[in-house]
Amino acid sequence: MSPEPSAKTVQLRRYDLVPGVLDDFLAWFHAEIVPVRTAQGFTVEFAYADREAEQFTWAVSVPGDAAAFTALEQTYLASEGRAAAFAGQPTRVAVSQVSLVETVVEAGSRA
């Protein structure tokens, strides 16, 4: 199924966190990452924390296709805002999984 030109591309990001850092990670994420990502043109679709498993899952999107997402991602990765957000930060993510995903059921849909 190919997306329509006006569709958005969503990237799912899943992190296994270093034990004991979840609260610090969440504070940093809210204060630094969300503002930098949104300033670069991304939409944060959702973010969930699993305290018991010390995992964090979130998604960002960009209007358009995967090429548009990749182009904006490269701009973000090279941005001063991202560099500042990560400057001096300890390692909090032990393992990450990042992939582009497709919508199967729209948020708020009822089965």
Where are the regions that the model predicts?
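Short, structured motif recognition centered on aromatic/hydrophobic residues
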Residues: 9-14, 25, 37, 56-61
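Short, flexible turn/loop "capping" segments at secondary-structure junctions
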Residues: 4-9, 49-52
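An amphipathic, aromatic/His-enriched active-site/gating alpha helix that lines ligand/cofactor pockets
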Residues: 4-5, 27-46, 61-99
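Basic/polar N-terminal segments that are highly enriched at the extreme N-terminus
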Residues: 1-7, 106-111
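Short catalytic/ligand-binding loop motif for oxyanion handling, primarily in non-cytosolic enzymes
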Residues: 55-56, 67-68, 108
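Long, low-complexity, Ser/Thr/Gly/Pro-rich intrinsically disordered segments that act as flexible linkers
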Residues: 49-51, 90-111
